[in-house]
């Protein structure tokens, strides 16, 4: 789990290197996912299941704004990995400076717009009925912390591009631990309700940003923050935009999917159905952390070796990553198949003073969520090919294939399915949409990746 120099990405054995890169990323994602999971448990236990639903409808908006930082980070880091692989340090430094400037301009602009149109935005994403007021409270406070989260996401990708996965892991662990402490203090001790949950998360975002800033000002980073490299370089911006647009488009589609899902679910079962989906979303983030960790670890290795024209190592990286992630995905599936009831119960409060509406929602959630979990995660053993395949094209700087493969699952398959299947199968149609979309997207990605490997990695 030690940090390595960027040159070692082209030297060390692939299996060992993938573990070194993936384990810190997976631990960071695990801690962050545990943070979201336990945060939701705090909210569910001490505020109520309506509050979980309220947070769920807000997250797609705030995460989309934060994803601007992620997209700039991923797009720029692909350039940085290839530049370091080609020994072009100046281009790497210029790219980093452009990332810093672009993240600031984009996120601040979006936050201002988000605050101005708050009353119009959150109802569109499903904040209706008794969900609206708690969602608005949470949303406004969280927006103040979103720029810090965006910078953390951007910096985290640059750390991995440098071959510093341990520091990237720390950047995710620090805010997660801080958020848990602040949740306990503000929700349980001071009983601040939704405002407490929001301020806890916002404070954690700021702490994460502080650590990332420290890293890039210290001797640990190869890419120092330099005023001379800040600003906009049009060719670099175009490349960041073309590659980062893949990540942004993915988050945009995810946010749009949440919009559709929350509205369809509200029409089917009101606030209770949104609460079911909110719990599944929390479990999804937590359960797939090892697969996402391998995907993150895969990116800098593939990008560096492609830039260094070591194509045999690139192929080995692809196959090894898919194999490791598939095994871990199968283990995750078995766990969710066996213990869905226990996982659902974690989020539900048994407080005697719980409002009657929350008690009714709890009963509904406990009855409907376990079966939904089994369907939603049914294709987990095969999603590794889908994720690694799309990530590969992003790593090597091929923006169009990366974009199309990224949109395949959500945009081309899942959204049409959730618009069609509920008309015939009701609630079950929603949950069936998940594994069907996964299977179809995996087939398409596998065929395209196979064609690309035969054509270019020779």
Predicted regions, residues:
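Helix-loop interface residues and adjacent transmembrane-helix termini in multi-pass membrane transporters
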Residues: 37, 46-49, 83-86, 161-162, ...
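Helix-terminus/linker motif at the lipid-water interface of multi-pass membrane proteins
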Residues: 34-52, 122-129, 185-192, 255-280, ...
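Hydrophobic residues within alpha-helical transmembrane segments
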Residues: 23, 27, 58-61, 101-105, ...
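Transmembrane helical elements of multi-pass membrane transporters/channels
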Residues: 20-39, 141, 175, 204-208, ...
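Short alpha-helical transmembrane segments in multi-pass integral membrane proteins
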Residues: 1-22, 80-145, 189-244, 302-379, ...
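N-terminal transmembrane alpha-helices
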Residues: 9-46, 60-75, 79, 104-111, ...
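Short runs within selected transmembrane alpha-helices of multi-pass transporters and secretion channels
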Residues: 73, 142-160, 168-176, 197-212, ...
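Small-residue-rich hydrophobic transmembrane alpha-helices
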Residues: 52-112, 149-168, 276-340, 383-402
